[in-house]
């Protein structure tokens, strides 16, 4: 499965209902499992983002659907990046000669 990094910002609604955050995170984990993906790690962070999530999914389409479903709830906005492992990085570089 491919690895993805999601950079998360709380919306005003998300901040106002922050005490429900752990429950929403549990629901997100289940949604990932139901989609054949896995939410591997979640971090509350400081700086320009509020949280970071690391996930694995079978393809970009699955991650896009999960991101859109999450955004539709109105509590967070995400920016998701496809992350390449060191092995993938080395293979990509080797393939360009």
Predicted regions, residues:
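A compositional/biophysical signature of low hydrophobicity enriched in polar/charged and small residues
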Residues: 1-97
